[in-house]
A protein has these predicted regions:
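Short, polar loop motifs at secondary-structure junctions
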Residues: 1-3
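Hydrophobic residues within well-ordered, non-membrane alpha-helices that form the packing/core
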Residues: 26-29, 77
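Short amphipathic alpha-helical interaction patches enriched in hydrophobic/aromatic residues
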Residues: 29, 53-57, 205
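Flexible, glycine/charged-enriched surface loops at secondary-structure junctions
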Residues: 32-46, 229
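Active-site diphosphate/adenylate-binding microenvironment
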Residues: 44-120, 125
Length: 231
């Protein structure tokens, strides 16, 4: 009987071709069955996760709260959309709040935490899943690590929405510095016009400051042939 636990000890060692072994095992596996105790435990864990991540958005004129962004994404994005997430404070919010319901459709750089990974990942996803939408999520700092790859996305006419969480700083570095040193240094950078940046590559550029504007922009991104950047 399966148990929901973090500690799993092997009972048998299977030596041989992995694909062949799995095929052989699959022939002898019945339809999966989860008993009520396990379902109750899963529901309990789901409730704990929901409670732990139940942060409410605080509204400030002209500035979108991370929860507002994610709630809007959750409302507009379809389940077959591939979402690639760059590294930064937005990455923490996305990991805690955004829900994906298809395997391999929500990509994080957990181990190496590679700044600038989201757009190249999105390009790859758009090439291997040409008939679906891809959304790349990055902070303004991380986006500038690989933003020049918009040229590739435009040249290949890929259906990518590039979403930039713009606060004019490396926020993840900033709050870690403040936690450790009680101050921050070298984390701010000057203003960048990301709409004109996108247009200079031939992509569509949009700017939003409200939840309803983001909803409209995401829908426009779905209806547009080729890459769209939303600042």
């Amino acid at each position: 009987h399966a148990e929901i636990t973090n500690y799993m000890q092997p009972v048998k060692e299977l030596i041989g071709n992995i694909a062949g072994t799995i095929d052989m095992i699959s022939e002898h596996v019945n339809e999966p069955f989860i008993n009520q105790d396990h379902l109750d435990e899963l529901e309990k864990l789901r409730g704990e996760i929901t409670e732990a991540t139940g942060i409410k958005a605080t509204h400030k004129e002209g500035v979108m709260h991370p929860v507002e962004i994610i709630e809007t994404m959750q409302k507009v994005l379809t389940d077959d959309t591939t979402v690639t997430v760059d590294v930064g404070s937005h990455y923490i919010w996305m990991a805690r709040k955004y829900r994906s319901y298809n395997p391999r459709h929500l990509l994080f750089s957990n181990g190496m935490q590679t700044l600038g990974v989201a757009l190249p990942w999105a390009i790859s996803a758009a090439l291997v899943r040409p008939n679906t939408q891809v959304v790349s999520v990055a902070g303004d700092g991380g986006f500038l690590f690989s933003g020049q790859e918009l040229e590739t996305a435009v040249r290949k006419n890929l259906n990518i929405i590039q979403l930039i969480w713009n606060d004019g700083r490396y926020n993840m570095v900033e709050f870690q510095e403040e936690m450790k040193y009680k101050r921050s240094a070298g984390v701010e950078f000057g203003p960048v016009d990301y709409v004109k940046y996108a247009e200079s590559f031939g992509a569509k550029g949009l700017r939003v400051t409200k939840q309803e504007e983001l909803e409209a922009a995401l829908k426009e991104g779905y209806e547009t042939d080729g890459p769209v950047l939303i600042d």
